[in-house]
């Protein structure tokens, strides 16, 4: 019997446990996940309100990791971020200035020597610009050696000067915003037009008006919130974070300063670089100096947003920008004295948790106060009278202070553009979209590492000259020609004298009847045949066109014509 009662008790306990588990599961499933679609301030009943100064109203900067107990010092700043294109090649031109010379040396005996030479000349900036303009228009006519100008017993020189333009891209060092290439002295040149290691050559970027630089600068408002003061003498360790409107917060720990795109900025611990400066519209903010940060170690690299992968972020930024423009338009209306609506007032409100300005209108006058904004889920909007929704702690959120609208009967206005009409609370249109866009922007974006360019410097300066001597068919080496001509003349003269003496001797012998006339031919034939053989055996040396090139290059040359 006892065993049976124990078995029944066990079965009942098991059934009760199943019922309890099923109930808990059903209750959990019936609970909706917290999905905030509104930010609303918690207001103290004793909060003080003051009349707003339209000239001091600013569009909101949101907060992400603000801790009111820890972060008691706020510094409003301007943040600029570059989106560097991965192609750091800079298109440009090189200008070579050369002189073509043709020299004709004709002595008194009418035997000219013609030579051609190419010499480098120092090029001027104005000459290079004109030559590039002709090159771009296609009107440049390339020159060569001028025709010779020969006259008796003189040396005449004719010369042409020409500037040869060639396309020559170089690299851009985004850290210093300088050009990098082996043709520059030391491998580096400032933007625009620069000299090279050759005196006769200059490099010019394609766009003479604007120097290439990092593109796609994005300007945003930011806020540094920290736990203590900081200055040049205090290390920047755990002083707080910087919030950038539309982006994730960044901790200032391990941040350092480094030059990028020709600007001094801050590299954060995640590798991303930004230029940060104080917004002068807030003179009461803590003085912020980039020099407060220690310099980054040599060789430190940074990361920038990948241009081709930020389309989703651009979409969210577009939404943010649209509402920011509406905010600026609202402020402009107020300053100009134009009427504004409750919807216009909602554009002045931040969309992130943390401390911020709260606005309300009473009898046409705008008042402001300070409240602590929190996320609200409006799924229970108007479930009870004046209910806006629930916060992340599950607490119901209400607003009960309403004032009659001065422009529309039956409409009541609360704070931050919230209105009540026909007993129903109406939330400003677009608030949910703004919050969604801001939340999406809190996530990271793809980045790429920017490396330092590596270059092996060839030379700081190189002298170069090229001279070409051309001996053609109608031009000779005068000294050699004169020597050969005189030598040949005397050789022939000796032969003719010998033959003349032999001939005269034979005639004398015939006249004196020493040798009969019939033997004259027998005596003369051997010498004549011998002379003919000697003369024919002499061949003139072949003459060919010869070219000789002399190079004078004291240093190593990295480029040639």
UniProtKB/Swiss-Prot annotation:
Subcellular location per the Swiss-Prot or TrEMBL entry: Virion membrane; Host membrane
Record key words, sorted: Clathrin-mediated endocytosis of virus by host, Disulfide bond, Fusion of virus membrane with host endosomal membrane, Fusion of virus membrane with host membrane, Glycoprotein, Host membrane, Host-virus interaction, Lipoprotein, Membrane, Palmitate, Signal, Transmembrane, Transmembrane helix, Viral attachment to host cell, Viral envelope protein, Viral penetration into host cytoplasm, Virion, Virus endocytosis by host, Virus entry into host cell
Post-translational modification: Glycosylated by host.
Organism superkingdom: Viruses
GO biological process: clathrin-dependent endocytosis of virus by host cell; fusion of virus membrane with host endosome membrane; virion attachment to host cell
A matching Pfam family: Rhabdo_glycop_CD
Residue spans crossing the bilayer: 496-530
Segment forming the signal sequence: 1-30
Topological domain ranges for the Intravirion compartment: 531-561
Virion surface side: 31-495
Membrane topology, from the record: Single-pass type I membrane protein
One GO location term (cellular component): host cell membrane
Reported function: Attaches the virus to host receptors, inducing clathrin-dependent endocytosis of the virion.
Subunit text: Homotrimer.
Stated family: Belongs to the vesiculovirus glycoprotein family.
Name assigned to this protein: Glycoprotein
Organism: Drosophila melanogaster sigma virus (isolate Drosophila/USA/AP30/2005)
């Amino acid at each position: 019997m006892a065993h049976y009662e124990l078995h029944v008790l066990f079965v009942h306990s098991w059934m009760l446990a199943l019922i309890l588990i099923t109930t808990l599961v059903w209750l959990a499933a019936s609970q909706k996940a917290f999905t905030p679609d509104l930010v609303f301030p918690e207001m103290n009943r004793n909060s003080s309100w003051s009349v707003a100064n339209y000239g001091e109203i600013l569009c909101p900067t949101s907060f992400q990791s603000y801790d009111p107990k820890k972060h008691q010092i706020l510094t409003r700043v301007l943040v600029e971020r570059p989106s560097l294109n991965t192609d750091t090649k800079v298109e440009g031109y090189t200008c070579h200035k050369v002189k073509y010379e043709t020299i004709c040396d004709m002595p008194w005996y009418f035997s000219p020597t013609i030579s051609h030479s190419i010499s480098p000349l120092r090029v001027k900036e104005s000459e290079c610009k004109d030559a590039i303009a002709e090159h771009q228009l296609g009107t440049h006519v390339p020159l060569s050696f001028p025709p010779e100008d020969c006259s008796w017993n003189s040396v005449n020189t004719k010369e042409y000067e020409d500037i040869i333009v060639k396309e020559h891209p170089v690299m851009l060092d985004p850290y210093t915003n300088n050009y990098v290439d082996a043709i520059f002295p030391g491998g580096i040149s400032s933007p625009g037009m620069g000299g090279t290691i050759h005196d006769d050559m200059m490099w010019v970027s394609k766009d003479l008006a604007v120097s290439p630089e990092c593109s796609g600068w994005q300007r945003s408002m930011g806020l540094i919130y920290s736990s203590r003061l900081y200055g040049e003498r205090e290390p920047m360790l755990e002083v707080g974070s910087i919030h950038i409107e539309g982006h994730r917060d960044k901790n200032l720990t391990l941040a350092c300063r480094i030059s990028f795109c020709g600007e001094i900025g801050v590299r954060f611990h995640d590798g991303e670089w930004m230029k940060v400066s104080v917004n002068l519209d807030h003179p009461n903010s803590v003085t912020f100096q980039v020099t407060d940060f220690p310099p980054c170690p040599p060789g430190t690299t940074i990361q920038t947003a990948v241009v081709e992968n930020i389309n989703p972020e651009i979409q969210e930024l577009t939404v943010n920008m649209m509402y920011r423009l509406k905010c600026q338009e609202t402020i402009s209306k107020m300053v100009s004295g134009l009427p504004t609506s409750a919807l216009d007032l909602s554009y002045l409100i931040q969309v992130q948790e943390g401390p911020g300005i709260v606005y309300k209108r009473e009898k046409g006058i705008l008042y402001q106060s300070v409240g602590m904004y929190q996320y609200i889920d409006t799924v229970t909007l108007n479930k009870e009278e004046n209910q806006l929704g629930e916060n992340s702690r599950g607490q119901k959120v209400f607003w009960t202070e309403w004032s009659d609208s001065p422009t529309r009967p039956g409409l009541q206005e609360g704070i931050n553009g919230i209105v009540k009409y026909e007993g129903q609370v109406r939330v400003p249109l677009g608030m949910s979209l703004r919050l969604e866009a801001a939340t999406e922007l809190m996530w990271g974006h793809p980045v790429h590492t920017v490396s330092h360019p590596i270059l092996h410097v060839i030379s700081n300066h190189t002298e170069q000259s090229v001279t070409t001597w051309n001996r053609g068919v109608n031009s000779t080496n005068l000294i050699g020609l004169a020597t050969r001509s005189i030598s040949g003349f005397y050789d022939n003269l000796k032969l003719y004298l010998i033959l003349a003496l032999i001939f005269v001797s034979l005639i004398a012998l015939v006249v004196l009847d020493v040798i009969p006339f019939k033997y004259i031919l027998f005596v003369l034939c051997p010498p004549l045949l011998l002379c003919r053989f000697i003369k024919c055996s002499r061949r003139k040396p072949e003459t060919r066109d010869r070219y000789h090139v002399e190079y004078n290059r004291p240093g190593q040359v990295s480029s040639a014509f």
